[in-house]
Every structure is written in C-alpha cells, then in structure tokens.
Amino acid sequence: MRRVLFWRYWHKRDYNRLGSALTPPSNSGVLMQIVLRGAAAGYEAEHTARIFYPAAELSQTLPDDTADLVLAVAHRYLLLVLVRQNGTTTWVQQRPPQGDARTQEYALCRMLYTMLCGVTGIRPPWGMMTGVRPVRIIHDLRAEGKTEEEIEQRFLQHFDCTPRRFAMAKSIADLQRPVLERAQPMDCSVYAGIPFCPSRCSYCSFVSRTVGDKSSRALVAPYVDCLCKELAATRAAADAAHLSIKTLYIGGGTPTSVNAQQLRQLMGTMAEQFDLPALEEFTVEAGRPDCTDEEKLRIIKEYGATRISINPQTFSDEVLRNIGRRHTAQDILDCYRTARRVGHDNINMDLIAGLPGDTVEGFRHSLQTAIDLDPENITVHTLTLKRASNLVVEHRDADYADVAAMVESCELLEKASYRPYYLYRQKGTLQNLENVGWCKPGYECLYNIYIMEEVHTILSAGAGGSTKLVAPGARHGKIERIFNYKYQTEYIDRFDTILARKEGVKQFYDQYPNCGESARPQAHGGV
C-alpha cells in the first residue's frame, strides 16, 4: 500500500462531512492519507507527518468519505488536528490560535505529533524534531547562555526526544567543542566531486554515471580535465577572498572509478594548487574495492592524502548482491589490508543499517567485522528512502522493522572504545533514525564536523557541487550558495559559466571587510 500526502485548500464544509463521532485513538498502524491546510501548517506540519510516513506522496485530491486520513488545519480562528479511520472520526484536538506564528506552528505540530504517536504506536527516537542537525542546537543554546539543565529540558520536553538520543547528541557536542573553538572566521574547506561509479547501488539517488557504460566512460577524461581547471580557479577564488583552506575532501560517486592516470592527474592538481603541509586534513573516498587497487591506493598516499574511506556498507555477500554491488565481502577485506600495507594509517569504513535482505544478526556481524579490522573511523548510516533511488521503486513494500535494532548494535562500537563525533539526520530515513560517525580518540574527521555544524565556508568543485559561503565570525549567520550544473554533460559543455561563478566568492566576502563577530540568530532545529 502507498502512503499518500494530500494538499488542498480547506473549508468548513470539509470538516462537517468528516463526521464528529469520537472514539479512543487506534494503535492499529493504519496507513493514513494526510491533508494539511494553512500557511502555518505547511512546511513543519508536513515534515512532522513525514516522521511517521517518510515515503508519503503528494496529491491535491481529497479522499472520499470512507478513506482513512489525517487532517491538520491552521486558520486564523482555529488550530485543528483530526483523524478518521474506517469512516469514523477517532481522534480530534482543536484550540484557538495563541501567540506568534512560531508558537502557533509548534502548537499545531505538537497536536499532530501526539495524535500520530497514538495512531501508529510509534515513539520516534528524536521526538518531533524535524531538523537535520540536532548537535547544532546544543551548540547554539550554549552560545545563548542556556544552562545544561535548560538544554536537556529543550530536548526532552519541547522536542520529546528520548534520553538516549539526547545523551548522544550532548556527548558529540562536548567532543566537538574544542574543534569549533579553534576555528577561525576566514577558514574554509574544499570539496571535489567525482560523479562516476563502477555500478549503481540500489539505494543511491545521486546523479552518478557508471563507468562500465561506453557513453559515460567517454565523459570521464574531459570531466577530470574540467575539474582540475575548476580546482585551480577555486584556489584563486579563495586567495582573492583571503580564505585559509583547512581541509580537502575528494568524494563521489566513487573517486577511484577513474583510471590510475586520471586519478594521478587529479591528485597532482590538488598537490599543486593547495598547500598540503598546512592542511589539517585531506580525505579521499577510495570507496569500493571493485575499482580500488594497490596502484590507486599508492597514488592517493603519494600525493598527501591523510585519510581515506573504504566503504563496505555490509559484509554480507547476499546483501551486496541485493544492492547491486559487484564485489564480495572478501574483496573489501583484501582492499583494506592492501591500504594498510601501502601506509594508510587513517581509514574510515561506512556501514548502512536497513539494507534489503539484511537482518539484525547480519548487521551485527558486519559491524563486528569492521571493528575487528580496527579502522580509525566507522560511520553507521541508516538507510534513507529517496524517490530517485531504485530501492524505492523495487522494494516499496519491504519490511524495515528491524532497522532500529540494527542501530542499537552500535553499543559494540562503544565497547570497542569508539566514540561518536558527528551526527546528522535525513528526511526519509527509516524509523526516523540518524547517521553517526564514530572514531578512535584523536581521529575525528574535521571536514565532517565543519560541514555539519556550518562553521565555515565549503568551496565545492565538480558537477552538482554546491558551494556554501558562511559569513565570517558568525555561527549560522548569513549563508549564500553557488551551484554548479548538476549533470556531467552540462558541467563540461557550460564550463565557462562554472568558472565565471567563482567571482561570487570574493563578492560575498567583500561584504565583510573587517570579518568581525555578528549577532547570532535564534537557535532552531525544526519546531
């Protein structure tokens, strides 16, 4: 069955025909159709509903009288949430609007959240929080002078976050504090993207092309040429704006899907354009073992990378086949050991909880296998259902009920002396869970902290790149973005426009000649 999110203008006659018989809320977990109405009901109410129905689809058609639905309304004279099941109204809450628009928005979303908890029987681990950066809220509240008790109350009472999730967010904020305190107003990082892969994973919605396809393979060489030119222009833009580059990150896609000569060209450009000894960190996503051999690992090491990622996602051959990977778990083990042999001493490994065909026991096995390899970082993602991914189309009715138990397996990481150092959430993530980076002491990925907490500018190069310009000296102050063309062919064909847009970096920083502290905005993280 599909979960449908309906939008339309609401009138009093619609409420009248929904019925008014009230019975206790059902915990049957019925798949609801949702109607939202009113400016204050819009964005936050939609995403509150998506906590429970992440794969909801949009429509403008009101269901008939027999359909199950949720109605959330924000009018100048009424805030109302109503549930109808089996043709009968089973839950209704209403109240007059009070306070400013944000207070009314929170009141409506709280009623909607409480009702959906009752209808579905679900207690989301992050409560009604809709923001993707919970840790940032702690940093902001501390900056506002809030006490630790007030911050805890904000999470547990205002958001209805579970104590376990709050404790994790707080421990991450504590670990990040010294990193953020030493960040300077004119610091920045540079990201270079390689939007090519050996094959397409079923969960991926990224605009990446497979190098096995002849037409895609023909794009790789001109793409790498353009990327190297853009990196030179990026360095020039950083110099013109008086920015200090602290970290480099080459991601994808799969950067090692290019051949060894092209990888050497890219790495050589990075070494030529950027002062590598002055960097805090230089990460390259080696990614998949089916395109990462010893020669490429040596090139990455030779040109100064200080951190790499080798991303198994799972150590189950069956699950690897399910997601479209063309390698085995043994290939991952061999690649990791080769990386160690050539001298890589800071390695991250990614795992994903909730992949099709995986089990709690299978995920624990994958996690323990990664721990036994002893990498410096292990990042645990929760599967996110994205509409552009094959997984949504092919596995729409799959049962992902075990994913929460998989995520709880991260206790194994704590026992192995790993600690969480960064966290973010995504819309559409199964069970409203999170993605967490774990590290050994002293091996935090600084780029991940900087980009998640938005403490400094990220200059992006490559197709689909999004440069994020952050006002100096102001956490979460003014942010502007410069977008690159999304598709590889467009990026290559319109490359002159890409270069011209680099002028926007200096223009942004010309607004801040003194780079002084500016006022902090009010902290928020959803409602």
Regions of interest found by a model, annotated:
Residues 80-81, 192, 308-310:
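Short beta-strand motif preference
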Residues 119-123, 143-190, 241:
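N-terminal [4Fe-4S]-dependent radical SAM core
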Residues 131-136, 172-173, 207:
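Short, conserved phosphate-binding/catalytic loop or strand-edge motifs used
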Residues 193-208:
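Local cysteine-cluster metal-coordination motifs and their immediate loop/turn environment
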Residues 318, 322-323, 353-360, 375-399, ...:
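Flexible glycine/acidic-rich beta-alpha junction loops that bind and position SAM and/or redox cofactors
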Residues 403-428:
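TRNA-binding/sensing appendages of the translation machinery
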